[in-house]
Design a protein with these regions (language model features):
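N-terminal extracytoplasmic segments of bacterial inner-membrane proteins
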Residues: 38-75, 115-132
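Polar/charged, Q/E/K-enriched amphipathic alpha-helical segments with strong coiled-coil propensity
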Residues: 102-159, 174-177
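Alpha-helical segments in soluble extracytoplasmic regions
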Residues: 63-118
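Juxtamembrane interface at the cytosolic side of transmembrane helices
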Residues: 1-18, 192-214
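N-terminal membrane-insertion alpha helix
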Residues: 25-43
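N-terminal membrane-entry
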Residues: 179-197
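Polytopic transmembrane helical bundles with strong interfacial aromatic enrichment
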Residues: 20, 24, 125, 157, ...
Length: 214
């Protein structure tokens, strides 16, 4: 029987390397996808909390207006304002939820929302002091006028800050989800192509070995 000194078969070595590369690709793409999906989930949670905060702020703005319309009979509406702002600003409230979900990258925008909400709450307190002190026209001017220190201006700053924070989180959500989709596409195609190439290389290697012993 004819002997050969060939020890390493290039085809089989190539097939082995391709299989290992396919495995590494699959593991890497899976980990990357999991990370991106986790990020997308967090940004989605932050967006939801900020959406809820914006809705609560709009309801509080309506409560503020109703108090002025009631002229002395708006205790219920003012309590509604306080309850809604507490839901936004209070411990474990919507801004805390959004901040925890967004992480350090979204902290600045959410801190700006918090500062604006505190500013509006202070402006509302001044509006109530004007109304309770018999200065109803001044209270109305604060609610609907253009004074930068008034309640309307403070509310608009808050609404703008909420809009910026929401846009930031939605954009981050889209980026993370898009990256996850791309990774899944690569996960489906890459290892499959490498496996086919490995099979072809293995077949070529076996054919060489068969000829050697033929």
């Amino acid at each position: 029987r004819r002997r050969t000194n060939r020890i390493l078969n290039p085809g089989l070595l190539t097939a082995t390397a391709l299989v290992l590369l396919a495995l590494l690709w699959w593991v890497g793409a899976t980990v990357f996808t999991d990370v991106r999906l986790s990020q997308a989930t967090r940004h989605g949670a932050a967006s939801t909390a900020l959406d809820d905060a914006r809705a609560a702020v709009l309801q509080a703005r309506s409560n503020e207006s109703l108090v002025l319309v009631a002229r002395g009979g708006g205790r219920t509406s003012d309590a509604g304002y306080t309850a809604r702002l507490d839901r936004v600003l209070g411990p474990g409230g919507l801004l805390d939820t959004a901040s925890a979900a967004a992480g350090p990258a979204g902290a600045l925008a959410i801190d700006e929302v918090r500062a604006a909400a505190l500013g509006w709450r202070d402006a509302h307190g001044q509006l109530r002091a004007l109304d309770d002190g018999g200065r109803y026209p001044d209270a109305v001017a604060s609610a609907i006028g253009t004074d930068p220190a008034g309640s309307r201006a403070a509310f608009e700053r808050l609404d703008t800050a909420l809009g910026r924070a929401l846009d930031e989180q939605r954009a981050a959500l889209d980026r993370s989800a898009g990256a996850a989709r791309s990774a899944l596409t690569g996960l489906a195609a890459g290892p499959t192509v490498l496996a086919l190439l490995a099979a072809a290389a293995a077949a070529a290697g076996i054919a060489i070995r068969v000829r050697e012993y033929g």
